[in-house]
Every structure is written in C-alpha cells, then in structure tokens.
Amino acid sequence: AVQATFFWSPLGVVLNGVVIGLITALIALGMLLIYRAGRVLNFAQGELGFIPAVLAVMLIVESELPWAIGLVVGLTASLLLGGAAEFLVIRRFFRAPRLVLTVATLGLAQVLGFLALMMPRWWDSRVASQRIDVPLDAVWDVGPIRLGADHLLVLIAAPLLLAGVGALLRWTGLGVAIRATAERPDRAASLGIPVRSIQTVVWAVAGALAFMALFLRAGVLGLPVGGRLGFGLLLRALAALMIGRLNHLPTVLASSVALGILHQGVNWNQDSPLVGDAVIALVIVLALLVRRSRSDRGELELGVFQAVGEIRRLPVELAGLIQLRLLRWGAVAAIGAFLLWMPHWLGTENLLRFSYLHLVVMVVVSLVVLTGWAGQLSLGQWAFVAIGAVVGAKLTQELGADLLLATLGAGMAGAVASLAVGLPALRLRGMYLAVTSLAFVVAVTTYLLNPRFFDWLPQGRVQRNPLLGRIDWSSSFAMYHVSLVALLVTFVAVTGIRNSRTGRVLIALRENEVAAQAFSINPTRAKLTAFAISGFFASCAGALIVHHQQALVIDDAIRTSIGLFVAG
C-alpha cells in the first residue's frame, strides 16, 4: 500500500522488485530455519553463501567452466560450509546464553566475509560485482525495464526452493524432527531425536539457501561489491522475520517480496538509493509498532538473551583487607599515571587515534547500561552518536555555546531520542528491539542526518572554541586530555549508577522480571530509564566526536554500531 500510494512505479519495476524480494526471501528462510532449530538469530546468514557463491562465480568467469558445473560445485560447498560452521563454531556455544551466540554469529560473519574477499586471489582476481549469465538467450522489455533470463530464473527457481523447504518441514520426518527440536529441545533429546545433528543439517540447508540467493543475485545484479551482504538486504530479511513473528513462514515470505517491491519503487522515484533504505527502515518501525503484542512460543522467551553474568565481587571479609585496598588504589593510580604520561611520547596521529578511542569507549559503556544491565538488545547505538554530533555542533558553532553546555544539551537530545526508540521494547519482546534499533540507525545515518539531503546540518569545519571561554583545546595534545577526562567522568557516573538503586533494579529486571515486579518494581519506568541513560552518554560522546573530527562524519555508521555491540 505504501509503495502504490507514495512511490508508484511501472510494471517492470514491480517485477524487478518481486525478483529482489524472492532473493531476500531465501535469506530470510535460512534465518528462520536456524532460529526455529536453535533459537538464535543468525547474522552470518548472508556470509554463509558468499564463499561458495564466489567460488562458483570464479569457476564460471575466470576458469570458464560451464554454468551448471559452477552451480553444482557451489551448492556442494555451501552444504559443507553450513554444516562445518555449526559443528566447529556454533556447537561450542550450545549451552551459552543466546546473546553470546548472537555475538558469535556476528564474529562468524566477519570471518566468512574476509575469506570471501581473499578467495578470488587464487585466480589473481577480486570481488568486483562480477555477473554470470544463465545459458539461455531471453530478453524482454516490460515498460522501461529490461528483464532477462536471469530474472526469469529467479521467478521460477526461488518459489520452487521455498516450496520445497516448506514441504520438507511439513511432510517429512526430518521436518518433524526440526519442529520438535525447535519446540522442546530437551524433550526431543529424551525421545531419541539427535538434536545437535538436526541443527547441523539445518545449518547445511541454510547455507545452501544463502548460496542460491547469492548465486541468483550474481545473475541479476552481480556479486555484492566488497564481498559482503548489503545491510539493506539484511535489514529487509530481518524485517520479514519480525513481521512474521519468527514463526509464520507464509508471512515471512510475503513480507520479503513486499519489501523488495517497495524498495525498488522508492529507488525508481528517488535519485539516491539511500532514500530507499531509509523508507524501508521507517516502514519496518511502523510495522512493528502497530503489531499487537501477544505471547508466542515462536518468540524469544523471557531471559533468553540474558548476558553471561557479572563477575562476582570479592567477599566483604577479603575486600576489607588493607592489602587488597592498597593494591586496588595502587593499580588505579598506575593506570592513571600511564594515561597521563602516554601523550608525551605519542605523535600527533597516534594522539588523535587514542583520543577517538576514549570517545568510542564512552559509547561502549553506554551500550553496557542498555544491553548488559537492562538486557535490551540494541544494534543502533551509533544513531545516538550521530544525533549528539549534530546537536553539539549546532550549539557550539551557531549558538556559541560552551562545549560543556553543548555536550549536556546533546546528551539530553540523545536521551529523548533513545526513549522514542525504546517505546517498542515496552510492547514487543525478543529481537524486535534489535531490528527496530537497526532500522533506526539506517534511517538516521543514511537520510535523516545526512548532509547530502539537508543543508541545515553542519557542513563545514567544526571549530574547537575555547573551553569555558579561556582554555585552548585546539591541539591534539589538549584533545587527548579532554577525551580522557570525559571517559573518566563517564566511568565514575556509570559506576555510581550501578551501585545505586537504579542499577540494582535494572539487574533484577534482567535476571527475573516477574520476580522483580513482585517487589513493586515498575519495569516500564526502569527500562525507559536505561534507554535514557544509554542515549545520554552515547550522544555526549557524539558531541565530543564531532569536535574531535572537526566535521560531521557518519560514513560506515551501521558497521560501527554492530562492532560496538560486539565490543559491549
């Protein structure tokens, strides 16, 4: 409805959107299978298909082997790679909290993406959007769009693959075993079902689906530039899963196709493809907000994304020993002296790097409050950094505010924005917040706060005006100390919050929300507090980062957000 109303496009564009949507559906189906079998959202789903897809394309393009041989070799490699990934990596986290396993899939995606980039070197080549053509000669024009045999292959092969997997799950013994493992893994194991072997098979099938998606995409659009799955495709696949509540296969597949049509319609009506990702992100947020909240066994149960746990504190008897207290304060003093002495032997370039590192650690600390304490999974922390950067630069450059006031103002703006993003978390469970926050960072950094679209955003050089009207901090040496002081203040503030009632309440909610409510704790208020605190510190860091960089830089914000999540 959104596409037809606001982004009308001719039939050829709609058909092209169906093609892209079917490719997205293959990715989403693989993610759904893995989630149903192991209750983990696999962020490495696209990368599972890259290595075999690159192998198949290189065999066809560089070695000049027939198209069918490349397909068979790639499909075989994808089955082996999917099974190996589960056996060598995922199985090691079988008993770990799902949050840890989610981080493991993010790390697996990085490794597989790197290997996909390295593989073409065997042919003295590189991943450069190579295309492969189906050995059929068919071209027809549908309005202004020219479709070929590669599009026809997707329209035929993708529905057959989707129907085949659906039949496998519904009418075969393997499908029954997969569904039993997904519903009650412990009971399935007690009935003699090899749960871990079933998961290996599921990962192998998911790897094959990922390969077919990338192989078909190579015929239509070519291999992804840089050897990595585009975040737009990943976001659409995640959105389809969330709309289908990680459970209803027809809804997931229909949503994938609908989002593909919408994306192509937006691109047809707009000059920049970045607008398409922003519109998709907005539609995702609205779709998740209007869904009615209800309990579903397909969703993540309470506490499934609980962190590993905190390091136990020393017993009171040991902590009170004078030797340990002296050791603790001595270690703090030694670290402080080292940090203060370090800039004297660092060059300008390294000083700026360490200054930036201090500010990034501030963002990581803000994420610890939200995910580590409150148990809310967020992938969009860098969006609040961007908001803080814009507000901080506007306050100092246009209104002449002091850096301290600008940083506090940016923090308040980030807290308000974080509350707005956190509202879905009060109605929706599990991974919905992760997808909402990922959609939010895509919308903010690709369009809403992109200087290419809005001239009111900071465009030129951001000057470092004197601090408190008299302290010059324009040098890299002074910038280092400003960032260090900001990091120390953040540590002290967050430590105080952790030791206060607010921190204890957040930990209690993360561990057992039902029991915490029995002690008259308001979970809504506590979660919103965590969002506000997290957004405040992230935006404060953003205000300092824009002055450190002396320009508004939001490139690669999505990967940075995911990297911050892994670090946190």
Where are these regions (language model features)?
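Helix-capping/transition residues at the boundaries of transmembrane alpha-helices
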Residues: 35-38, 60, 90, 94, ...
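Transmembrane alpha-helices and adjacent helix-loop boundaries
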Residues: 8, 46, 99-128, 149, ...
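Hydrophobic alpha-helical segments within and immediately flanking transmembrane helices
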Residues: 23-31, 41-62, 77, 81, ...
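Alpha-helical transmembrane segments of polytopic integral membrane proteins
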Residues: 28-37, 56, 81-87, 108, ...
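Short, hydrophobic transmembrane alpha-helix segments
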Residues: 2-14, 32-41, 57-69, 268, ...
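Hydrophobic core segments of alpha-helical transmembrane domains in multi-pass membrane transport
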Residues: 1, 56-57, 75-81, 108-117, ...
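Interfacial "coupling" helices/loops that link adjacent transmembrane helices in transporter permeases
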Residues: 173-199, 510-514, 521-525
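Membrane-cytosol interface at the C-terminal ends of specific transmembrane alpha-helices
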Residues: 160-182, 199, 203, 215, ...
